[in-house]
């Protein structure tokens, strides 16, 4: 029961995220799972079976055979073609890089290391995206809510996302406009408060995926010691097409030679025995498959990196994306295509309100939740921007700010007085309820005095301006 709970707890780390694309999932989800499966398969054969079997002289007792096989497995073997005489090879000629076989013991650990490297960029993206003001993972999850088929739930979720995104985008814009430096010493940490933080971090994650796949191809060639071909997979396919067997190619040889010594009384006997590497039957198939899978990953990562670089770096693609969604919305201003006013409004909406991160989040929502939900969200954000833009002159003036503060304070004081007054109301018998709720003389005088004070404050503000 405990093992099942542990497995279910680990399953969430193997599940896909909602803030990525198809190329990311190939890198951080599918590839590590494939590598883990291969690592477990090889481990079962190594530690649960006989990965190597050697041929010994008849005089060897059973204990010697077990010792020799364990020794040859833990030490390096070397490859010799069937036509060569082992006795004619010098010791330094036997363990040259072209002949020495030292990788097969480490295959499970090498595969686990590769899985960790493929998974690492996703953790980097998860960490930094959670430290930004926009919770993109939660935004996409809310957009993908299956309950959005109901109109009320859909409108509620759009309202929640609009408020969250508007608040986060407004905060980022204020930080950049006021040039607030939260971190005085390490200034580059202030980058997380910029309006392009998530976009650049995601693009950096794409670069890491690309570099990782390229590095894994190189490390595989280095690990297997394939010096004859710089591109291992193509070399193996070429040998197979040309009909060259493993006895001459040396790639994952089934048979190898092992040298070991046995101490007998005062003498040391040296033996060279031929061993069958059964494990290489699995290794050959696994690494050929992985090599071509990595080539596919390299191509997909390149395409995805170029695609996101173009749409994030060049503003014209952001404006085109938003304009297409606004054209699909119910807004009357965008029924006419290619109008100058429409282009101007979209340009201001993208550059002054959404910025780079806002468009990036909308792209993720459109990719995961569909174009219909994304269009409704774009429309809601544009309506919020349009309302803010129309009231910018009134809200941004010093007079209106002070007047708004005074009005708010006056309304608050009136509400407080009404609350105190309500506690003193006496319901008199024989009088209508409306008569008993009328304010008394003291309240009228207090209210008039407060109104006179508010008018004086407004006059002082206007005079100072």
Curated annotation (Swiss-Prot):
This is Innexin-11. GO terms for molecular function: gap junction channel activity; gap junction hemi-channel activity. Keywords: Cell junction, Cell membrane, Gap junction, Ion channel, Ion transport, Membrane, Transmembrane, Transmembrane helix, Transport. Structural component of the gap junctions. InterPro entries: Innexin (IPR000990). It is found in: Cell membrane; Cell junction, Gap junction. The chain crosses the membrane at residues 29-49, 105-125, 195-215, 286-306. GO terms for cellular component: gap junction; plasma membrane. It is a multi-pass membrane protein. GO terms for biological process: monoatomic ion transmembrane transport. Residues 433-465 are annotated as: Disordered. PANTHER family: INNEXIN, INNEXIN-11. Belongs to the pannexin family.
């Amino acid at each position: 029961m405990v093992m099942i709970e542990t497995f279910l707890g680990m399953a969430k780390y193997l599940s896909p995220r909602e803030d990525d694309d198809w190329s990311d999932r190939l890198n951080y989800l599918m590839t590590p799972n494939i590598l883990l499966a291969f690592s477990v398969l090889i481990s079962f054969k190594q530690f649960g079976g006989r990965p190597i079997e050697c041929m010994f002289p008849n005089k060897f007792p059973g204990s010697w055979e077990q010792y020799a096989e364990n020794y040859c497995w833990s030490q390096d073997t070397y490859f010799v073609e069937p036509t060569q005489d082992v006795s004619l090879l010098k010791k330094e000629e036997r363990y040259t890089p072209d002949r020495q076989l030292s990788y097969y013991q480490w295959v499970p650990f090498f595969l686990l290391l590769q899985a960790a490297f493929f998974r690492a960029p996703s953790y980097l993206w998860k960490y930094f995206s959670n430290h930004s003001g926009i919770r993109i993972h939660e935004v996409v999850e809310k957009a993908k809510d299956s309950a959005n088929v109901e109109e009320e739930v859909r409108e509620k979720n759009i309202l929640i996302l609009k408020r969250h995104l508007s608040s986060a985008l407004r905060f980022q814009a204020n930080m950049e406009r006021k040039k607030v430096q939260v971190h005085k010493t390490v200034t580059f940490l202030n980058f997380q408060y910029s309006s392009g933080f998530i976009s650049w971090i995601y693009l950096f994650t794409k670069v890491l995926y690309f570099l990782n796949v390229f590095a894994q191809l190189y490390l595989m060639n280095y690990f297997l010691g394939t010096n004859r071909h710089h591109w291992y997979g193509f070399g193996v396919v070429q040998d197979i097409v040309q009909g060259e067997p493993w006895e001459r190619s040396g790639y994952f040889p089934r048979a190898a030679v092992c040298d070991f010594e046995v101490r007998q009384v005062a003498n040391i006997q040296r033996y060279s025995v031929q061993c069958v590497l059964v494990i290489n039957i699995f290794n050959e198939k696994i690494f050929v498959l992985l090599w071509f899978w990595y080539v596919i990953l390299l191509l997909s990562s390149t395409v995805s990196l170029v695609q996101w670089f173009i749409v994030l770096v060049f503003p014209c693609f952001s404006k085109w994306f938003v304009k297409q969604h606004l054209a699909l919305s119910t807004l009357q201003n965008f029924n006419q295509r290619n109008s100058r006013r429409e282009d101007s409004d979209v340009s201001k909406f993208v550059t002054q309100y959404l910025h780079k991160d806002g468009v990036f989040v909308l792209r993720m929502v459109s990719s995961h939740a569909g174009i219909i939900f994304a269009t409704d969200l774009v429309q809601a954000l544009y309506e919020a921007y349009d309302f803010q833009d129309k009231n910018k002159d009134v809200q941004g003036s010093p007079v209106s700010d002070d007047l708004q503060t005074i009005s708010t304070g006056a309304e608050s004081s009136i509400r407080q007085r009404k609350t105190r007054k309500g506690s003193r109301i006496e319901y008199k018998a024989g009088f209508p309820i409306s008569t008993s709720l009328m304010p008394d003389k003291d309240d009228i005088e207090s209210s008039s005095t407060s109104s006179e004070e508010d008018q004086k404050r407004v006059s002082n503000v206007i005079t100072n301006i």
